[in-house]
């Protein structure tokens, strides 16, 4: 439900330069002016010895004793000519040193995870994936004479106060990579981390020059600092000679940003962190990873067998016809698939092992609803992600149709005739995807022509509407995990085919200069049913849906575009009304969230046969399942008018939600202020009538009474039994009943004011609801939010206490 929102709410801390999705050759870094390093002396930190209680782990979280055929006593690996031989005993001793005095670590945001792909790399602290598998949230590696360690989130060493035993973990990590050498840790262009590490007892020196950094025994730098092969080789040489390297990487965060802003989001090809980490024996995955206990990431949770690539390969070799035990099978399949997906293609032993798996006879399985590819099919999963990366690495060629294209997005009807010389006018004032009304059939070549004057604008052509990569998000695949591609329009003529096909879009990135009008010509694609508000009528739509036999169709308004199977939209009779409805909904959301005007791109909704999660989620595009109940509410006038359309209005709300007034527990709550606002303003359906029993006075009062009887636990506000977000939504529904929509309109506008005092954490977000409303209405709102068990701070309480008590007893109904 909150794929994009989590980017706003998670404190996504990426080191300067670490975000490097670069489809073209990177610009050379300007040489920094040499300055004396700023040394920050550490605060003294007592090295506490904590008695580590052995937390009972689940079966899948406990390392079992492998047979001798699976666990070698000593193994070697080579990367770029550097051989590193490490024994299991040395790795065990290293992990013991790193977690000495540490029972758990914790930080803000959702950290990413890693897979160790070489025997010289090892997991330090485990996290738990959504499916019960385990991978490192902190990983480390021996490399030549040196050492490296990577954390799954930069906020581990950027945020204070420290949570759990994070300070001790950081001190241990720096000591381990320094190997007893004297000298400060060089912190390269990462000022916030320097101060925080000093508070953890580490002596640091801030530097702006890499040569200066390499003069220290150890350095902290974002992987983006090494964005050329030459810089990376410098780093590898430095570590191999005995240097220490510490960094962070968030594969899932980078991927989400890249999908939304560059279009090039393949970990193995576009993520610079992989090019830094993989030669060290580690790859970053595209999954955020969860805690292993209430305190955070527990060091007492051991890694299960199969959590690293060498062990997973050994197990796969031991069971060539399939792994019999389910937990082990799931762990090994996850490790092999995610490692193959993230590993940059090279001539290493690890990549050769992936290629060998992909050539196994069982690898030929094609995902479809009839032949789903499950965790047991790890040979096929590895083949599919390798083929995907091979395609995306060389998209401008004629690729044959993939057999799974018939499942999604579907194939053109036989006998359809391709177009030639269709002109598309693209105005760069409108960002993101421009619909062409053309469909590329899987395996059929299309040619795109742009004028020479447009080559410097950064335009792209995209084939395919869905942006859901299900590689690691779904245990079972019924379609290929990635079916869309983006190609830079850096030549006047390019001919290519997509293995999967899909709608053709011309993409205007946010970096493209505005004020340009470009004529693009397309050959070889097929016309599809495409309604465009202001150009077409209900009558022309009826003719198009009857004439053009593409598997997908689009209806496009001024603010939003809906992409659905043609078979679904064939019943649509009034696209003029439907597009206006969604345009108006977008305008209302923009107004409520207090943006200065319409967005410079159109929102999108796409129906897919398999999503990353659930049946609906937000993002660009918003995604819904082709069989989701209520989909007709997206495009059927009578259904919308009679019942509203909660689902997509909810997801559209996520796209306009403001993280400044949404704290973590409220992510699925405040979004529905938008849902109710649009339902009321557009359809005249009042909040209490908007969603049956879930919003009725009777239903809400029952939930409140039950919650009060349980002692009003704040942990259940927004996520308790039998209420989902609807108990928490009552907090805001009562405010709307008492003060009208004006309360939210005025309140949200305050957060957009220049120089507004914006909250920095969840405590301040909650506090500002109370203080801002108290100042707006000159009444003490702290009482109200505390009646809902919000932990309002004493400082905020003091501000609110300047005003008289609220006297509206309906606000406090059943609460006291």
Language-model features, listed with the residues they occupy:
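Hydrophobic core
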Residues: 9, 13-17
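Helical hinge/lid and interdomain linker segments adjacent to catalytic or ligand-binding clefts
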Residues: 81-95, 107-116, 130-132, 145, ...
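Short, surface-exposed beta-strand/loop micro-motifs that present aromatic residues
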Residues: 133-144, 551-554, 773
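Activation corresponds to long, low-complexity, non-globular regions
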Residues: 289, 296-403, 552, 556-570, ...
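Active-site-proximal alpha-helical
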Residues: 305-331, 337, 341, 562, ...
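Beta/coil-rich, acidic/histidine-enriched accessory regions frequently appended to metallopeptidases
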Residues: 348, 352, 356, 363-412, ...
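Beta-strand-enriched, solvent-exposed domains that form extended recognition/catalytic surfaces
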Residues: 394-528
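Catalytic cores of extracellular degradative/oxidative enzymes
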Residues: 541-737
């Amino acid at each position: 439900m909150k794929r994009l929102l989590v980017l706003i709410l998670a404190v996504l801390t990426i080191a300067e330069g670490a975000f490097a999705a670069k489809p073209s050759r990177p610009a050379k870094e300007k040489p920094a002016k040499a300055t004396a390093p700023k040394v920050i002396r550490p605060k003294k930190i007592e090295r506490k010895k904590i008695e580590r209680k052995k937390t009972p782990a689940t079966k899948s979280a406990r390392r079992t004793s492998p047979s001798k055929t699976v666990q070698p006593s000593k193994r070697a690996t080579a990367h770029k000519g550097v051989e590193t031989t490490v024994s299991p005993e040395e790795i065990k001793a290293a992990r013991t040193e790193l977690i000495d005095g540490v029972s758990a670590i914790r930080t803000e945001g959702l950290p990413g995870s890693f897979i160790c792909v070489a025997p010289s790399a090892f997991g330090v602290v485990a996290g738990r994936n959504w499916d019960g598998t385990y991978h490192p949230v902190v990983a480390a590696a021996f490399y030549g004479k040196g050492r490296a360690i990577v954390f799954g989130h930069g906020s581990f060493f950027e945020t204070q106060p420290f949570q759990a035993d994070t300070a001790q973990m950081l001190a241990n990590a720096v000591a381990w990579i320094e190997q007893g050498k004297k000298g400060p840790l060089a912190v390269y262009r990462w000022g916030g981390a320097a101060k925080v590490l000093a508070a953890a007892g580490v002596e640091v020196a801030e530097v702006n020059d890499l040569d200066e950094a390499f003069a220290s025994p150890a350095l902290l730098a974002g992987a983006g600092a090494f964005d050329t092969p030459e810089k990376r080789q410098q780093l590898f040489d430095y570590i191999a000679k005995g240097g220490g390297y510490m960094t962070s990487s968030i594969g899932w965060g980078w991927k989400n940003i890249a999908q939304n802003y560059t279009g090039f989001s393949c970990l193995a090809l576009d993520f610079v962190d992989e090019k830094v980490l993989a030669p060290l024996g580690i790859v970053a995955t595209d999954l955020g990873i969860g805690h292993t206990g209430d305190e955070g990431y527990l060091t007492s949770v051991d890694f299960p067998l199969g959590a690293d690539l060498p062990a997973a390969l050994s197990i796969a070799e031991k069971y060539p016809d399939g792994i019999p035990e389910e937990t082990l099978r799931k762990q090994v399949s996850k490790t092999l698939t995610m490692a193959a997906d993230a590993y940059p293609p090279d001539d290493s032993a690890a990549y050769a092992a992936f290629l060998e798996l992909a050539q196994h006879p069982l690898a030929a399985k094609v995902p479809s609803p009839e032949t789903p590819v499950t965790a047991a099919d790890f040979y096929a999963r590895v083949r599919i992600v390798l083929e995907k990366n091979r395609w995306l690495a060389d998209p401008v060629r004629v690729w044959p149709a993939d057999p799974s294209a018939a499942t999604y997005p579907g194939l053109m009807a036989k006998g359809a005739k391709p177009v030639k010389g269709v002109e598309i006018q693209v105005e760069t004032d409108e960002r993101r995807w421009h619909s062409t009304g053309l469909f590329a059939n899987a395996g059929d070549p299309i040619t795109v022509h742009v004028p020479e004057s447009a080559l410097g604008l950064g335009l792209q052509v995209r084939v395919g509407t869905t942006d859901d990569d299900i590689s690691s998000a779904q245990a079972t695949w019924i379609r290929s995990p990635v079916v869309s591609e983006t190609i830079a329009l850096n030549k006047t003529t390019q001919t290519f085919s997509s293995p999967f096909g899909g709608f053709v879009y011309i993409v205007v990135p946010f970096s493209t200069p505005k004020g340009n009008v470009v004529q693009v010509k397309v050959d070889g694609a097929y016309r599809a049913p495409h309604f465009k508000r202001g150009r077409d009528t209900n009558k022309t739509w009826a003719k198009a849906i009857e004439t053009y036999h593409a598997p997908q169709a689009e209806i496009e308004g001024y603010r939003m575009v809906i992409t659905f199977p043609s078979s679904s939209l064939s019943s649509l009779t009034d696209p003029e009304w439907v597009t206006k409805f969604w345009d108006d909904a977008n305008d209302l959301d923009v107004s409520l969230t207090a943006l200065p005007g319409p967005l410079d791109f159109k929102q999108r909704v796409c129906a897919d046969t398999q999503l990353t999660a659930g049946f609906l989620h937000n993002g660009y595009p918003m995604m819904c399942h082709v069989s989701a109940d209520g989909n007709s509410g997206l495009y059927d006038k009578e259904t919308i008018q009679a019942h509203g359309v909660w689902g997509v209005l909810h997801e559209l709300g996520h796209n306009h939600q403001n993280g400044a007034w949404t704290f973590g527990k409220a992510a699925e709550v405040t979004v529905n202020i938008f849902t109710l606002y649009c339902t009321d303003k557009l359809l005249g359906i009042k909040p209490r009538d908007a969603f049956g029993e879930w919003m009725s006075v009777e239903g809400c009062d029952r939930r409140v009474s039950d919650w009060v009887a349980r002692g009003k636990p704040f942990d259940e506000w927004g996520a308790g039994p039998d209420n989902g977000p609807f108990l928490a939504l009552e907090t805001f529904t009562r405010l709307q009943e008492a003060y009208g929509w004006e309360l939210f309109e005025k309140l949200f506008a305050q957060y957009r004011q220049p120089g507004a005092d914006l909250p920095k954490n969840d405590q301040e977000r909650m506090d500002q609801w109370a203080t801002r409303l108290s100042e707006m209405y000159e009444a003490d709102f702290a009482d109200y939010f505390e009646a809902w068990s919000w932990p309002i701070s004493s400082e905020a309480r003091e501000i609110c206490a300047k005003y008289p008590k609220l006297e509206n007893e309906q606000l406090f109904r059943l609460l006291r």
